[in-house]
């Protein structure tokens, strides 16, 4: 079940109000339901685990989310452990690369004066190959 929560962050460093939608642990969930909760945001942040590492069954939902999310707002994706542990990650990554999402894998970007970054989950998991 998806739910919408609101957290307000204030800082003298933030010069304009921004609304971020954060999604994590989607695990092949319903793309349309998730995106309906995100309409009107300034950016979508994906914290990983769009897929379930044990099943290719829901990849279609993850691909739909990745293709539709950038139409709602600029989208930034940090791969989670479920993506990293996919036995066939080489087949999943092209789905990600075909979308207009920005992958944040041990890198940072500036978005309207806010630094967004992603840390590779592979760094914490010995033996994980870099993507």
Sequence positions of predicted segments:
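N-terminal active-site segment of His-dependent metallophosphoesterases
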Residues: 1-65
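Short, well-ordered coil/turn elements that cap or connect secondary structure elements
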Residues: 4, 15, 39, 70-72, ...
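Conserved catalytic scaffold of divalent metal-dependent phosphoesterases
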Residues: 11-13, 28-30, 51-52, 83-131
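Active-site neighborhood of phospho(di)ester-bond hydrolases with catalytic His/Asp-centered motifs
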Residues: 21-24, 44-49, 74-81, 102-106
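Generic detector of short, locally flexible boundary/turn motifs and exposed helical patches
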Residues: 40-46, 69-70, 80-87, 116-119
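Catalytic-core regions built around general acid/base machinery
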Residues: 61-72, 95
